[in-house]
Amino acid sequence: MAGLALACLAQGDCRAAAEEIQVYLDDLSAPGQFGLDLHSNVVRSGATSPSYAGERPPQHVVRLTPELYFGLTPALELGLYLLTAHPPGAAWQVDGAKVRLKYIAPHDGATGGFWGLNLELGRTALTVSEKPWNAQFKTILGYRGGPWKLGANLNLDASLSSGGGPVALSLDLKAARAVAEHTELGLELYSELGPLRRPDALSRNPKTIYAVLDQEIGGLDVNLGLGRGLTTEADRWVLKLIVGTHF
């Protein structure tokens, strides 16, 4: 299996794409079942100098993040991420690890609304984060009706390290429509909003919209998206691909 997300044709100032570009829905492994997703991206044209001492500039760095998860109960799933990167002219490096616990409330999986929560804790290298210990609390909301699927994640990101700064707010949205059996087309929007207590103007911070294809192929779940940055702080063009399976 392989996953690849390429930031392509980018021009101007860019930031490193996240290790996981995904809107959480009600996907959940059955109790005792494992799953594996692979996420990857590369900024083709971006910053070439660090924004803080020790940061690895993102240009031409390939990021690959395997995500292994396991169903604990019908409503709980435990996941583990390993963050890796391949800088130009260097060997693969480990950027840290994260663990998550996802809860999805019982619901009709075929139609109607659903909700859940996701808590993530991690330690990352100085190359990708100025503070090593970080946490994210994610709300999961969604709805299925006819051929349509809607999803929304409101995220609170906080540093657990000393002097980590204010809690940051972001919003991820998804709307997809089934166009054939096992095939959906849609849009995903990823918006960083700034500090929770005083969000920034909408014209600030990275915001990117993706045209996406969701496809089941031979037991694999594929999410392919082409993204367009909407602000000067976002990558201009991003191509993302996530490949997942259960076993």
Name each region found by the language model.
Residues 1-20:
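Cleavable N-terminal export/targeting peptides
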Residues 14-244:
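Transmembrane beta-barrel domains of Gram-negative outer membranes and organellar outer membranes
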